[in-house]
UniProtKB/Swiss-Prot annotation:
This is Molybdopterin synthase sulfur carrier subunit. Its main location: cytoplasm. Pathway: Cofactor biosynthesis; molybdopterin biosynthesis. It comes from Phaeosphaeria nodorum (strain SN15 / ATCC MYA-4574 / FGSC 10173). The modification Glycyl adenylate is found at residue 96. One of its GO terms (cellular component) is molybdopterin adenylyltransferase complex. One of its GO terms (molecular function) is nucleotide binding. Belongs to the MoaD family. MOCS2A subfamily. Heterotetramer; composed of 2 small (MOCS2A) and 2 large (MOCS2B) subunits. Disulfide bonds: none annotated.
């Protein structure tokens, strides 16, 4: 799933599975730049309850590179999401 190119001063965010269901969207554009450590708070402001119900168990990628927001890796938390970046919120993967 590719999103439309983000407008100037924004980045794209893709929502999969539970994140898409919770937001009612598959993608949107948010203002850039933003620190990765602030992303979940920004999403919580837009979609109250999403942090605890969805984001706590999701993985996050920035331009297809996994970053660790939940566990607090210092380098990942300080990473700045820039204009034109593509962020994805990915649910846990299971197999059976």
């Amino acid at each position: 799933m590719a999103s439309k190119k983000a407008p100037t001063g924004h980045f794209s965010i893709l929502y999969f599975a539970a994140a898409s269901t919770f937001t009612g969207k598959t993608s949107e554009h948010l203002p850039a730049p933003i620190k990765a450590c602030d992303l979940f708070d920004t999403l919580e402001d837009r979609y109250p309850g999403i942090k605890g119900k969805v984001l706590a168990s999701c993985a996050v990628t920035v331009d297809l590179e996994y970053i660790d927001i939940n566990e607090g890796d210092a380098a990942d938390l300080e990473r700045v999401i820039q204009e034109g970046d593509e962020v994805a919120i990915i649910p846990p993967v299971s197999s059976g």
